[in-house]
Amino acid sequence: MRSPERVLNSLSEHSKDVSYKFERLYRILFNEEMFYVAYQHIYAKEGNMTKGSDGQTIDNMSLKRIEKLIDTLKDETYQPQPSKRVYIPKKNGKKRPLGVPTFNDKLIQEVVRMVLEAIYEGNFEYTSHGFRPNRSCHTALTHIQKEFSGAKWFVEGDIKGFFDNISHDVLINILKERIADERFIRLVRKFLKAGYIEEWQFHNTYSGTPQGGIISPILANIYLDKLDKYIKEYIAKFDKGKKRKFSRESLDFGNARKRIVRRLKSVKDERQRVKLILELKAIEQGRAKYPNGEEMDADYRRMKYARYADDFLVGIIGSKQDAQQIKGDIKNFLADKLALELSDEKTLVTHTERPAKFLGYEITVRKSNDQRRDKRGRLRRTYGKRVCLNVSMETVRKKLFDWGVLEMTNRNGKEIWKPKCKSGLIFNDDLEILDSYNREIVGFYNYSVSYTHLRAHETPEHLV
């Protein structure tokens, strides 16, 4: 019996050949050691001690239990139990559904997840940041800071009810492009069809992946990798021009400089030369105040893209018409190829001077005074735009809502936010209460300060 490390490494190596089709994957689930590793992965994770619909938790693991589970996989009598539907409160008073699988389902899902990750992770695009090893919200925001400078328009993408609207048939067909193992495919389909439990009533799910399911994130990325690759090809066709034309100001200063340099070559009088050198320095200083490139160059276009789960952001150096065309093309691709719908109310074409919302940040592109020296040592101003990230008030409020120190009421159709007592701390002494609040505030601040500063009226302590 091969070790899990060797099994997964072998899958990763074969995945480098994009034409390779994986067979006999289902047999990996007969390897007891795979289940030991899966158990180690999920045992300590928060939420895995939550009771599933079978009323069991993940503790009290036993070898006999694993052997029995493997036997049901071998004869394909294994049937996932309906996920227990847990509702997570949202700031508007509504609740978000979360499917909590049973213990056995969690264990098998983790083994399946490891197999799928070994096959697909190496071929995912660098523009995808959600639910991936060594990637996070931070890498997505860093990507945007580095690549979106100079963008003129944003397309804020939001896929309507993504997790609940994934087409099972489309997903299975995508998996079959790389996996030629019907038993493995049948197992994935079983998980997709497992349904959920709400108020102890069984409901079938004909689309969607439970958001609390362990394999949900990897399945979501496999599904939306099609979008990532479509946009990669789109960018290759959209981009044009090697660099921007010189701006009018840059050309004028450049011509003035050439005239002075020519005069310096012929002037012998020292006082006259000093005067010309001072003029030359003034020209260099003036030139550094303006961008070197033309802001709206019809022969220069660029498109950038970043995705985290079902949210994505597109940055465009081009016209508003270009941005609207891109939005329409993405909408058509999602509908035609992935059976998904863009949310019209949340998918916006926004000028980059106005904030676009992404991962709890308000993102803008603003003028910059950054300068650099060219290969001759002369100061040049860069294009003159940089990405600015600001934590939105909505994000701060949501964080306070999650802490349980803020509540919202609706008065005549208007949201009213009120402070709320954190009743779980009432038996603590004053120092313990302060320490609890400080840890939450410092943690949130450290997360946010990597990219921007919080204005005084937006800090958690101000609202608390």
Map each language-model feature to its residues.
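Conserved pre-catalytic core of RNA-dependent polymerases
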Residues: 2-214, 218
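Glycine-rich, often proline-containing surface loops adjacent to acidic residues and nearby aromatics
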Residues: 93-94, 151-153, 304-313, 418, ...
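Short Gly/Ser/Thr- and Asp/Glu-enriched loop/turn motifs at secondary-structure junctions
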Residues: 81-83, 307-309, 344-347
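Conserved catalytic core of two-metal-ion nucleotidyltransferases
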Residues: 338-369
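Conserved small/polar residues in nucleotide/adenosyl-binding loops
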Residues: 452-461
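Conserved polymerase palm-domain catalytic core
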Residues: 126-127, 132-135, 139-332, 338-341, ...
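Basic, alpha-helical interaction scaffolds
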Residues: 376-449
